[in-house]
Swiss-Prot record:
Name of the protein described by the UniProt record: Aspartate carbamoyltransferase catalytic subunit
SUPFAM superfamilies, per the entry: Aspartate/ornithine carbamoyltransferase
Any Gene Ontology CC annotation: cytosol
GN (gene name): pyrB
EC class name: transferase
Function: Catalyzes the condensation of carbamoyl phosphate and aspartate to form carbamoyl aspartate and inorganic phosphate, the committed step in the de novo pyrimidine nucleotide biosynthesis pathway.
Organism: Aliivibrio fischeri (strain MJ11)
Gene Ontology biological-process entries: 'de novo' pyrimidine nucleobase biosynthetic process; 'de novo' UMP biosynthetic process; amino acid metabolic process
């Protein structure tokens, strides 16, 4: 398969084809089985996090170093010229990309990654999250994890639970899975946190089946993947939050009627939406999912920075 990802900006999931997603998943699996310590030899990657991050930043930096590359950058914008001296984001990007072979950026402003790609002088920009907009590399590790546990990306029943309105991870993953065949979605959320209309309209246009379900228990027996998210307390008053939260807590008891192959995923951090008794079940896979972030990001970096592998 030709590597169409070479020197490509990775800004949003809709801009990646099914073939490109499959190439990343395949490459992640190969790297997990057989480490490749020289794929980024003599390469420098700028890791610029204008917003707090733990898993994404550390997994990117681990991925770069395990491939033999070097990292420059920062994990807070507070001490940069952007914050201290009023430098524009466009100017900052132009300077930093002149030092590096790729530019990984997280930023609180929606559209910041797209802006960076316009001022990077051809250096590939990888979006590590831009506000509530897109988080494409989380989607890549999610896809790899689904493939690793199910052996396929077609013909799957997938449920998303919790905050489907503001959760950028569920938007991106829905758009990615919509590129595959035989996918059926279950959207389980309170009405105030329902999946946005534009996502449902995209699925309608593609003829992809989805159901709006009030209870997890109604969907669990049919599922291959149960993707949990945190309901954000700050969006509700105390009484409303208590009611909503209690309806979307997963326990080991909920999983008793589940298929043997069902895996529970979560972008983390969890608060109390997954009971700790789920951790000991064979369905729990969220910690392995987080670990897979290193392999998915290794695969992406290797493909973006190498014409052939």
């Amino acid at each position: 398969m030709a590597n169409s990802l070479y020197q490509k900006h990775i800004i949003s999931i809709p801009e990646l084809s099914r073939q490109e997603l499959e190439l990343i998943v395949e490459t992640a699996g190969k790297i997990k089985k057989e480490p490749q310590p020289d794929l980024l030899k003599n390469k420098i990657v700028a890791s610029c996090f204008f917003e707090a991050s733990t898993r994404t930043r550390l997994s990117f930096e681990t991925a770069i170093q395990r491939l033999g590359g070097s990292v420059i950058g920062f994990d807070t914008a507070g001490n940069t010229s952007l914050a201290q001296k009023g430098e524009t984001l466009a100017d900052s990007v132009q300077i930093i990309t002149s030092y590096a072979d790729a530019y990984v950026m997280r930023h609180p402003q929606e559209g910041a990654a797209r802006l960076a790609s316009e001022f990077s002088n051809g250096t590939p920009v990888i979006n590590a999250g831009d506000g509530a907009n897109q988080h494409p590399t989380q989607t890549l590790l999610d896809l790899y994890t689904i493939y690793e546990t199910q052996g396929r990306l077609d013909n799957l029943n997938v449920a998303f639970v919790g905050d489907l309105k503001y959760g950028r991870t569920v938007h991106s993953l829905t758009q990615a899975l919509a590129k595959f065949e035989g996918i059926k979605f279950f959207f389980i959320a309170p009405e105030v946190l329902a999946m946005p209309d534009y996502i449902c309209e995209e699925l309608d246009e593609l003829g992809i089946e989805y159901q709006l379900v009030e209870s997890m228990d109604d969907a669990i027996p049919e599922l291959d993947i149960l993707y949990m998210t945190r309901v954000q307390k700050e969006r509700f008053d105390e009484s409303e939050y208590a009611h909503i939260k209690s309806a979307y807590i997963l326990s080991a008891e909920n999983l008793q009627p589940a298929r043997e192959n069902l895996k529970v995923l979560h972008p983390l951090p969890r608060v109390d939406e997954i009971d700790t008794d789920v951790d000991a079940t064979p369905h729990a896979y969220y910690f392995q999912q987080a670990e897979n972030g290193v392999y998915a990001r290794q695969a992406l970096l290797a493909l973006v920075l190498n014409e052939t592998l």
